[in-house]
């Protein structure tokens, strides 16, 4: 079987955990391929139990699935161990979680520099989570990062940490007037933490490719969303990695020709956390309604999400840059009881209309949404399990979004629960 990529098609928080959980029972491997604990997935089991995951793939909640934290992820060891303990304390079996030897470790100096930099930037700050993700990726690109495999060689680890802190301490002390970190203490602390995950370190590339050769199905799970991609997102208000489908191959070690299906997760309206342009953003009553009804608060940060109407411009853009083959539309139930539901079908910029993503951020900041008003529905749709169970106007809304997004809507979420899903098309079925 080929690999499947699952990506967010907006600014993150689209409901990727629900999609992974739905597919988990039919795949053998689930891989997290980028990001760190700056993003979170929420999974609600049929029992009503709620799990918030930040580093560990959502497939850990499905028995028998092997989960992998891929080489494209940056791992905070303390967060990893805390998340493992939280799952195990609730009876979740984590024995089949593996960690790529080539994933990078997020160090204390990354967090320190991230937090102090944001404070130093003041009103010009980007709005990071302050968890050290960006500085860790900076070290990766600068070839001075600490990788998971380094904990297996104490001497090399000590040498790398000492070399890194020769520079980092200069930054902390001389620029930001903070205390220097002791290399020996940093190494000692990391080695103590490593005792809790050393047995999970693996050659993930080899294992995943062997699994595909043997006919297994591998689900590649991205965090955040397309518009937060460092290359294709609303730069500079983006993350430091590639959540887009192209990042799945790089962040897992699976060749791109192995990937046959790209499942985009698309919320029935739009949200984003942090700074940056957001053409359809709502304020006052409409924004309050979506925020309250949709429970729009960040899993990782707890910050209230900015809310807006569905934006077909960014949906089409996501379809294009990811090669999306199918969409999973989530939170359709949140729109129930609205008289009309506006959908953004284009932008007006300086008096000119466009249906494409602006090339510059300054243009996007000036973009005014052009709306198409669709009739709403009043019925509670949370019990719908077939497409025909939906009210006619809800079906029309889905079909219109499918038409203007550029890919079929194969699944629809009508509530937070695993079973509150309508499957219109089996995305795991082989296609000609």
From Swiss-Prot:
GO cellular component labels: cytoplasm
SUPFAM superfamilies: P-loop containing nucleoside triphosphate hydrolases
UniProt-annotated binding residues for IMP: 13-16, 38-41, 129, 143, 224, 239, 303
Keywords for this protein: Cytoplasm, GTP-binding, Ligase, Magnesium, Metal-binding, Nucleotide-binding, Purine biosynthesis
Cofactor note as given: Binds 1 Mg(2+) ion per subunit.
Annotated localization: Cytoplasm
UniProt: Mg(2+) binding residues: 13, 40
Catalytic activity reported: IMP + L-aspartate + GTP = N(6)-(1,2-dicarboxyethyl)-AMP + GDP + phosphate + 2 H(+)
NCBIfam families linked to this entry: PRK01117.1, purA
HAMAP family assigned to the protein according to its UniProt record, in alphabetical order: Adenylosucc_synth (MF_00011)
Protein name, entry field: Adenylosuccinate synthetase
């Amino acid at each position: 079987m080929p690999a499947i990529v699952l990506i967010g098609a907006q600014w993150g928080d689209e409901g990727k955990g629900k999609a992974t959980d739905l597919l988990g029972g039919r795949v053998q491997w689930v891989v997290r391929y980028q990001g760190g604990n700056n993003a979170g997935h929420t999974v609600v089991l049929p029992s009503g139990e709620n799990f918030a995951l930040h580093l560990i793939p959502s497939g850990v909640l499905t028995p028998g699935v092997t989960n992998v934290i891929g080489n494209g992820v940056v791992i905070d060891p303390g967060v990893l161990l805390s998340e493992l303990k939280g799952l195990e304390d609730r009876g979740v079996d984590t024995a089949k979680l593996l960690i790529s030897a080539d994933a990078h470790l997020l160090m204390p100096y990354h967090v320190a520099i991230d937090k102090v930099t944001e404070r130093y930037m003041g009103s010009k700050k980007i709005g990071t989570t302050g968890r050290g993700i960006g500085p860790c990726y900076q070290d990766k690109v600068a070839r001075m990062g600490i990788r998971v495999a380094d904990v297996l060689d104490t001497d090399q680890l000590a040498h790398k940490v000492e070399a890194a802190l020769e520079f980092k301490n200069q930054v902390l002390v001389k620029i930001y007037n903070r205390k220097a970190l002791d290399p020996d203490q940093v190494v000692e602390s990391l080695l103590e933490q490593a005792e809790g995950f050393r047995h999970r370190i693996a050659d993930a590339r080899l294992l995943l490719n062997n699994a595909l050769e043997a006919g297994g199905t591998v689900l590649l799970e991205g965090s955040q969303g397309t518009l937060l991609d460092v290359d294709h997102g609303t730069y500079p208000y983006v993350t430091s990695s590639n959540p887009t489908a192209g990042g799945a191959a790089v962040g897992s070690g699976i060749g791109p020709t192995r990937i046959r299906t790209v499942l985009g997760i698309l919320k029935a309206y739009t949200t984003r956390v942090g700074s940056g342009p957001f053409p359809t953003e709502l304020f006052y009553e409409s924004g309050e309604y979506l925020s309250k009804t949709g429970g729009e608060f960040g899993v990782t940060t707890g910050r209230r999400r900015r809310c807006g109407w569905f934006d077909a411009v960014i949906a089409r853009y996501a379809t294009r840059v990811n090669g999306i083959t199918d969409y999973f539309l989530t939170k359709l139930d949140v729109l129930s009881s609205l008289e009309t539901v506006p959908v953004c079908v284009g932008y007006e910029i300086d008096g000119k209309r466009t249906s494409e993503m602006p090339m510059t951020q300054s243009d996007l900041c000036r973009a005014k949404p052009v709306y198409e008003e669709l009739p709403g529905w009043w019925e509670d749709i949370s019990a719908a399990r077939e497409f025909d169970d939906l009210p006619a106007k809800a079906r029309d809304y889905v079909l219109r979004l499918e038409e203007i997004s550029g890919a079929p809507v194969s699944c629809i979420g009508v509530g937070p629960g695993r079973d509150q899903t309508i499957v219109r098309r089996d995305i795991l079925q082989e296609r000609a």
